[in-house]
Amino acid sequence: MEDCLHTSSENLSKLVSWAHSHGTICSLIPNLKHLLSEGSHGNLTAMWGCSAGHAYHWPLTATCRAGSQERVCFQDNRSFNSDSPSIIGVPSETQTSPVERYPGRPVKAKLDCNRTRDSCDFSYCSEPSELDEAVEEYEDENTLFDMVCESSVTDEDSDFEPQTQRPQSIARKRPGIVPSSIHSSSQGQMVDECSNDVIIKKIKQEIPEDYYIVANAELTGGVDGPALSLTQMAKPKPQTHAGPSCVGSAKLIPHVTSAINTELDPHILSASPSVISRPIIPKTARVSLASPNRGPPGAHGTAHQVTMQMPVSTSHPNKQISIPLSALQLPGQDEQVASEEFLPHLPSQVSSCEVALSPSVNTEPEVSSSQQQPPAAPTITTEATAQCIPAYSTKLNKFPVFNINDDLNGLCTSAVSPNTTKATRYALNVWRYWCMTNGLKDHTDITKIPAVKLNELLENFYVTVKKSDGSDFLATSLHAIRRGLDRILKNAGVGFSITSSTFSSSTKKLKEKLWVLSKAGMSGARSRNIVYFSLSDEEEMWQAGCLGDDSPITLLSTVVKYNSQYLNMRTLQEHADLMYGDIELLKDPQNQPYFARTDSVKRESRSGSTRVCHGKIYHEHSRGHKQCPYCLLYKYMYIHRPPTQMEAKSPFYLTARKEATDMGSVWYEEQRMGLRSLRGIVPNLARKVKLENCENFTFVSFTQVSRRLGSHSCCQ
């Protein structure tokens, strides 16, 4: 037994850690069961275990590394039964063929592990025939874990029986844990000390309800309920063509049956959906079928080598990650706290592992549920979850995101700008969340609410709507939500707008709320140290082509510039509220045409109001027609504008078309320009001429230029 002392401190630490973990789940004291035969490199492997079936294979040397050979490991097959001594680490020199040992039986498939953190390391050596082949090397054995203890605190005597009602799958194993816990079998094989006979011994089976480990989990959810979305999960590779070597999605799920002596055949691994009682969610597991020529000569052409891998990242699929033993979450420690904190309403029927791998509706750059789950896999839904879990997510520090497939999602889609689509869907989610949290689930579809009833709801909505954390929205955000809801109604063709006079009472409530938010410092307006453009800056803009009528963007930027200068429009709100009918083409007493901002659309709601001119734009040809404010505004309003957007109540600023070719005379879409795009026009002009502090330039930055030019703008 002196050879047992020839081991590394790391391996000794692993043995002590396993013994400690074993003591938390089993009252039996483990001891040294077997001293397995030497491998081709002269190292030994000791098997520690107890009479309950808990086993640990302990390498006795630290110098003998895997090098250029392939290791033997258990496959996660609950009905696994093999007579091959290579499974338990017996070297090939002392092994006899399964056909010789058991006549009449077909040759069993040899299981083989590539370099992956899932390997169980039952033997550090292999046949001499494999040593000369160029395969991946195990450079750091510290990243490999040798624990194969397959039980938990919740194990009962019934766990020793075949689990016919509890099919196991590779994908439902706990991600990011000790790899040896992933590879287990319902039967362990041990070599007797006094004979070469193979002893079949049942090992306690682990069920997902026992415990799970989540490394970096965040609370998400969907229609089917909350879920723990793993942030370090990798996208499973699509299944490729069948061949000697292929990597595919882990759809090979073994089904646990009562037939313990079932032959190890590749056909067993493909389970039919009809016999799967629980959904198959191949979140991270994948199967590699290695080339037959990499195995020993005796197994060439007959034995398929299967490897279970748990990739951590798509960029380095073979890179191993060392997980400290202190990070292990033992049963009964943190699981209960996490479940009580994040999943208070989760039914007990749903296992913790299923919750950890259920599809998420998170829209951040993680693996989508369609990529994580095959089309044939059923969704985890029960009547209990449908009754107690709302149909929206509860992601931490994020506003709820609904995943309801209805016609409203199509109404939010914009073919012009993805930002508009995002803002419209956000407004829809805010409305739905407000309705569901205020007992108004029948009114979540805003397009089916009559105008009078909707006006009453909006009066309460503008005053009481809040974020998911209970705080108020900024004034600009609340205004954008209103525009998003109005956009949905317009796309649905309901025949009314929430900005019309029919909704005057709700509009009044909105203005009162906006005034309160502004007084509280929650207007949302950026506080900037305003910087003014100089004459040289403006001249550089013209020369650089940033201003003019050469493209839809330049013409729109020029119109914004002149409206700010000559029509006294100084804030984003004034530009955003501007309607087509608010600017009129008039004539003065000298019969000179000019454009004036009269706000005629806003005056319709004011009885007895007289026309007030907030500014005028005359012809100015001192610098030519290319820079005339009157001519450029005329082109924007009457030449390059869609005919359907020339009504008085049409929005003034429209989204510019991005395709410069084949536009014809119409340069703009039939859609209002977004607030973000409108706000960024002036900073973008400053950025194009390479000015500093571009974000400090606003619509007011053009004021001094207009005074120096001596414009025709005036107020009456």
Swiss-Prot record:
Region described as Disordered: 84-103, 153-189
Annotated Pfam families: DUF3504 (PF12012)
Keyword match Phosphoprotein: yes
Matching InterPro entries: DUF3504, KIAA1958
Keyword field: Isopeptide bond, Phosphoprotein, Ubl conjugation
Modification Phosphoserine occurs at: 97
Protein name (record): Uncharacterized protein KIAA1958 homolog
Provenance organism: Mus musculus (Mouse)
